[in-house]
Curated annotation (Swiss-Prot):
Lineage of producing organism: Bacteria, Pseudomonadati, Campylobacterota, Epsilonproteobacteria, Campylobacterales
Listed HAMAP family: 16SrRNA_methyltr_G
NCBIfam families: rsmG_gidB
UniProt keyword Nucleus, yes or no: no
Name the UniProt record assigns to this protein: Ribosomal RNA small subunit methyltransferase G
Pfam family membership, one: GidB
Binding, S-adenosyl-L-methionine: G70, Y75, V121, E122, R135
Top-level taxon of the source organism: Bacteria
Membrane-spanning residues: none
Gene name tied to this protein: rsmG
Molecular function terms from GO: rRNA (guanine-N7-)-methyltransferase activity
Keywords carried by this UniProt record: Cytoplasm, Methyltransferase, rRNA processing, S-adenosyl-L-methionine, Transferase
Length: 194
């Protein structure tokens, strides 16, 4: 059960959140099979991805806005938007099939805090956010470079990384960061780059 999994990781949400997640699970399973949105479509796999998406809420600050780069099937950006309904969320995804899915979930769940952009992040104009997130898109240096156009002077970053993080950081030239490890995931939290 999702609620037990999240609460075991110090994440607590209202009942509405869990109801919305169950709708998301069903929609992802339906769309995912037809449109190849994700390779992991069992309920347990989706629950693990939801936990992976939300776990950083246990250690990051609260932000007024965020943009998720390459949201794909919804991780982490869509899940964060469901959990943080008073935070303005932007999902930036260039693939039309995935954008259609994200917009369908947005409409179904009435996510008024959410904007889905069908674009590559480097082509996005007139958007600046407090937090930039990304999971499994590209290396840290390139992510920092291609997101310059959407960052504020003091934006923070949250990248969901794997085992190659240490070597990526050597090339990225960042400071004021924190790495939080959970299983095979390394969460890279970079506070307020200027």
């Amino acid at each position: 059960m999702l609620q037990k999994l999240l609460e075991a990781n110090n994440l607590k949400f209202e009942d509405k959140f869990y109801e919305d997640c169950e709708v998301f699970v069903k929609l992802l399973q339906q769309w995912g099979t037809i449109h190849n949105l994700s390779g992991r479509l069992t309920r347990d796999d989706i629950y693990e991805n939801i936990l992976d998406s939300l776990y950083p809420l246990t250690f990051i600050e609260k932000y007024e806005s965020f943009a998720d780069i390459g949201t794909g099937a919804g991780y982490p950006g869509l899940i964060l938007a469901i959990a943080l309904r008073d935070t303005k969320a932007y999902l930036i995804e260039p693939r039309i099939k995935r954008v259609s899915f994200l917009n369908f979930v947005k409409a179904t769940l009435k996510l008024d805090n959410l904007v889905v952009l069908c674009n590559r992040v480097e082509e996005v104009k007139d958007l600046q956010v407090d937090l930039i997130t990304s999971r499994a898109v590209t290396n840290t240096s390139l992510l920092l470079d291609i997101t310059k156009n959407i960052k504020k002077p003091n934006s923070s970053y949250l990248f969901y990384k794997g085992s190659m993080l240490e070597s990526e950081l050597e090339n990225a030239k960042v400071n004021n960061y924190k790495i939080v490890n959970k299983k095979d995931r390394n969460y890279l939290y970079i506070k307020g780059l200027i």
